[in-house]
């Protein structure tokens, strides 16, 4: 009985954690500024390691970048900033209205 209870608690705890697991929060703005880009980059550097963990538990929600590209989530936007030297910030949650997919760029 103790084993079943322990497994049930473990499953419940991981389910709750997974449902609460969200990509980290990035600032949003329609106008790019150097200060906002630096703040976004600093948050990306601080949180990029979470992306590996989050990718196993949760599908990311699309976000719109200031370059009118729809990214698969904050992790993908940060990857572009940190590893592809893109100058982009998050504009809003959800896909861009007139966008090409991030994978095309």
UniProtKB/Swiss-Prot annotation:
This protein's GO CC annotations: extracellular region
Entry keyword set: Disulfide bond, Protease inhibitor, Repeat, Secreted, Serine protease inhibitor, Signal
Domain Kazal-like, first and last residues per copy: 44-98
Domain of life: Eukaryota
Residues of the signal peptide: 1-21
GO molecular function, one term: serine-type endopeptidase inhibitor activity
Alphabetical list of Pfam families matching this protein: Kazal_1
Site (Reactive bond): 53-54
Bridged cysteine pairs (disulfide): 44-78, 51-75, 64-96
UniProt keyword annotation of Oxidoreductase present: no
Tissue: Expressed in epydiymis, in the cauda, corpus and caput.
InterPro entries per record: Kazal_dom, Kazal_dom_sf
Compartments, record wording: Secreted
Job of this protein: Probable serine protease inhibitor.
Name of the protein described by the UniProt record: Serine protease inhibitor Kazal-type 8
Source organism of the structure: Mus musculus (Mouse)
Lineage: Eukaryota, Metazoa, Chordata, Craniata, Vertebrata
């Amino acid at each position: 009985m103790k084993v079943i209870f322990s497994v049930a608690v473990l499953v419940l705890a991981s389910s709750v954690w997974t449902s609460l697991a969200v990509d980290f929060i990035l600032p949003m703005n329609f106008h790019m500024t150097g200060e906002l880009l630096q703040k976004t980059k600093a948050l990306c550097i601080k949180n990029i390691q979470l992306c590996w963990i989050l990718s196993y538990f949760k599908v990311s929600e699309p976000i719109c970048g200031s370059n009118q590209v729809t990214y698969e989530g904050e992790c993908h936007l940060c990857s572009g900033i940190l590893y592809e030297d893109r100058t982009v910030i998050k504009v809003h949650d959800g896909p861009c209205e007139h966008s090409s997919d991030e994978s095309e760029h």
